[in-house]
């Protein structure tokens, strides 16, 4: 009987991916392979490996957007090869960025929204640092004119996200972070004023504190700074870290005065990929007016074909996220943003009431007075057979990722779990989550933990 060898080309075209030669061995992981691989095979290996990631829609720890419309996917694909920094080559992408800047300036009540300055960034952390840099430069210029030293700048804030710690270290600024004490978990006017001096470059309230999700009292702090100036002459500006609240308060709490309606507010940063509803990779910083951004911070570059002003901590980046942000502004308008976020707030309040009914949890934040989220701790004196780190790990077996963490210094004794309610998290999903939490509680009642997990062992920690 004659033997017939397969045609190699036919073999490559017709063989099932998983019976192919490429997938008969493990592909290299830490060294670049010597030979090429079929694109279908390389894709399938990576696709299958990514299944090991968590389901982003069940990630209730992250602030970042995990659901976008099909049109956003299309626009992102159309912009995959556009470098937004090259404004001469892609002038219309630059125009869309400019429109977003002025829309946000208007949304945040800039007195000169048509002419003020602002820019997109990779996220709210970069935007926050740019706002902080502008504060430092303005303070330094003021001190030089007064003939005073400029070597000991400080900045005052409440419990902040790690980007501000990075900013303070990288730019050699003393960070006067107001610690949590007792039941006070955010900044207060009194705590701010006792830390102010002539070297304070600015006060940075957070509109949506990472740890508790509350809004800090921007207007009350502003009024306290007004009084301080009357009494001492110290004129201290404010930057608002509105990473979350900047895309929430204007739509769901429009009467709250936190933005450029307050004269001391010189700049605001926000995250487009959080409650701005855009895909990952876009933030915004807007200045009150052009005079609030020192001209020395702006670079003009011409090596991409045209002269372009730029203020950023990076350079090349994709334009798709900016285009997607503009799409959301057109697609949703103020009414659409309000409807989406109000639905999230309503679900957060509902979750709070349902989780409280379980009986062993103390609700720390119920979705009112901050961002659409909720958090809880174990009631004092209750021993349910688990701690919150154990619960975070157990609920993960059902796919849910819920942050569990101890509070910052002076309240490390308080451990909480936090849920972010984002666009795409429905009331039905909330019911499924509550049912799974009940099953976890019942499991621990039958199988109590004698030695509970700690924060390092738990997989449910996230402040991003």
Curated annotation (Swiss-Prot):
GO molecular function: glutamate decarboxylase activity; pyridoxal phosphate binding
GO biological process, one term: glutamate catabolic process
Annotated Pfam families: Pyridoxal_deC
Sorted UniProt keywords: Decarboxylase, Lyase, Pyridoxal phosphate
EC annotation from Swiss-Prot or TrEMBL: 4.1.1.15
Residues with the N6-(pyridoxal phosphate)lysine modification: 274
GO annotations of cellular component type: cytosol
Keyword Ubl conjugation among record annotations: no
Reactions it catalyzes: L-glutamate + H(+) = 4-aminobutanoate + CO2
Cofactor(s) listed: pyridoxal 5'-phosphate
Domain of life: Bacteria
Family: Belongs to the group II decarboxylase family.
NCBIfam families: Glu-decarb-GAD
Role summary: Catalyzes the pyridoxal-dependent decarboxylation of glutamate to produce 4-aminobutanoate. Has weak activity with aspartate, but cannot complement an E.coli panD deletion mutant.
Protein name per the record: Glutamate decarboxylase
Natural source organism: Aliivibrio fischeri (strain ATCC 700601 / ES114)
Lineage, opening ranks: Bacteria, Pseudomonadati, Pseudomonadota, Gammaproteobacteria, Vibrionales
């Amino acid at each position: 009987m004659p033997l017939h060898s397969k045609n190699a080309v036919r073999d490559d075209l017709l063989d099932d991916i998983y019976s192919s030669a490429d997938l008969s061995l493990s592909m290299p992981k830490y060294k670049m392979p010597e030979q090429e691989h079929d694109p279908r095979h390389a894709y399938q290996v990576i696709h299958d490996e990514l299944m090991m990631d968590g389901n982003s829609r069940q990630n209730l720890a992250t602030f970042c957007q995990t659901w976008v419309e099909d049109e956003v996917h299309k626009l992102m694909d159309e912009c995959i090869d556009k470098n937004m920094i090259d404004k001469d080559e892609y002038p219309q992408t630059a125009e869309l960025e400019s429109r977003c800047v002025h829309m946000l300036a208007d949304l945040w009540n800039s007195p000169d929204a048509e002419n003020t300055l602002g820019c997109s960034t990779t996220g709210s952390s970069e935007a926050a640092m740019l706002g902080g840099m502008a504060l430092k430069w303005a303070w330094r210029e003021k001190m030089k004119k007064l003939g005073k030293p400029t070597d000991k700048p400080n900045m005052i804030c409440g419990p902040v996200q790690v980007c501000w710690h990075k900013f303070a270290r990288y730019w050699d600024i003393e960070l006067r972070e107001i610690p949590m004490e007792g039941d006070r978990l955010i900044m207060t006017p009194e705590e701010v004023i006792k830390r102010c001096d002539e070297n304070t470059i600015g006060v940075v309230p957070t509109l949506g504190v990472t740890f508790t999700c509350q809004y800090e009292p921007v207007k009350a702090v502003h009024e306290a700074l007004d009084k301080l100036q009357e009494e001492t002459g110290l004129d201290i500006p404010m930057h608002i870290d509105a990473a979350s609240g900047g895309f929430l308060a204007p739509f769901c709490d429009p009467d709250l005065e936190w933005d450029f309606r307050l004269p001391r507010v010189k700049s605001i940063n926000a995250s487009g990929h959080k409650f701005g509803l855009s895909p990952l990779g876009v933030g915004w910083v807007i200045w009150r007016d052009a005079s609030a951004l020192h001209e020395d911070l702006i670079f003009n570059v011409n090596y991409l074909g045209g002269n372009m002003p730029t203020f950023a901590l990076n350079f090349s980046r994709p334009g798709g996220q900016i285009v997607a942000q503009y799409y959301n502004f057109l697609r949703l308008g103020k009414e659409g943003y309000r409807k989406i976020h109000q639905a999230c707030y309503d679900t957060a309040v509902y979750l709070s009431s349902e989780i409280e009914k379980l009986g062993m949890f103390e609700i720390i934040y119920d979705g009112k007075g901050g961002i659409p989220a909720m958090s809880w701790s174990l009631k004092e004196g209750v021993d349910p057979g688990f701690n919150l780190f154990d619960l975070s790990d157990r609920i993960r077996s059902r796919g849910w990722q819920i942050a569990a963490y101890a509070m910052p210094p002076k309240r490390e004794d308080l451990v909480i779990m936090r849920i972010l309610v984002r666009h795409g998290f429905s009331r039905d999903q909330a019911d499924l989550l509550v049912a799974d939490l009940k099953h976890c509680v019942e499991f621990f009642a039958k199988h109590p933990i004698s030695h509970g997990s700690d924060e390092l062992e738990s997989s449910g920690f996230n402040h991003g």
